[in-house]
Amino acid sequence: MSELILIRHAQTSFGHENYDNLSELGHDQAALLGSLFERLDIAPDRVIIGTQQRHQQTLENFNLNCQVDKHPGWNEYDFRDLLLAEFGPNIPQEIFTDRKTHFRTLRTTVTNWMNAKLPNASESWEDFSSRISNAVKFSCDLDCKQVVVVTSGGPISRVVATTLNAPKEEMMTLNLQIKNTSVSKFIYTPRSFYLHSFNSTPQFDGDNAHLLTYS
């Protein structure tokens, strides 16, 4: 029996031209989780990250002495590309500056994508789901007792929804709940794969509660 730990990256730079970059708070969040792992003596046999900068920057705050693999299957869906498919070149700019508008549009746009209403998207919903599935297979090494993956909210919510046999629309409900640097754990064997815990953030208990964010 082995453990797959999925970590959502730390807070990125909302409203900035380069979203794929941790904010100052994000670096603090990642350092907190790294310290927690060290205190708990978590020493995975294998670490995997997506190829986006926010995944690498989050991992840099961990002192993990093991092999690190990169796998693009753990990358987030391309929200800007989905917006282009939804709105064309005239994307409303408040989506990038107003959080309420951003998340409302995120839910609507991704739901349309799931239901094949965005034919011009570079990646189809089916292709996204398939690459996440392949990333899970790549990560679940039966020779490892513990595998840590640094990824994003979309892939994590897709894995959780699939594991629970939830309708695809539930992915967005899960996606919008996932906290920065949260930990979701899965147990796997040659014949089974199940959810053990979801969206855990003990590093933000007590005096660190003010550091908790969802985006």
Language-model segment annotations:
Residues 4, 145-151:
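Generic beta-sheet signal
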Residues 51-52, 73, 149-154, 198:
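Short, well-ordered beta-to-alpha junction loops that form the rim of enzyme active sites
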Residues 40-43, 139-145:
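Glycine-rich phosphate-binding loop signature in dinucleotide/nucleotide-binding domains
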Residues 196-215:
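Acidic, His/Gly-rich catalytic cores of divalent-metal-dependent hydrolytic chemistry
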Residues 34-105:
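Phosphate-coordination/substrate-recognition cap region in phosphate-metabolizing enzymes
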Residues 3-6, 10-61, 124-132:
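Loop-to-helix element that buttresses phosphate recognition and phosphoryl-transfer chemistry
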Residues 167-192:
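Domain-level recognition of soluble alpha/beta enzyme cores
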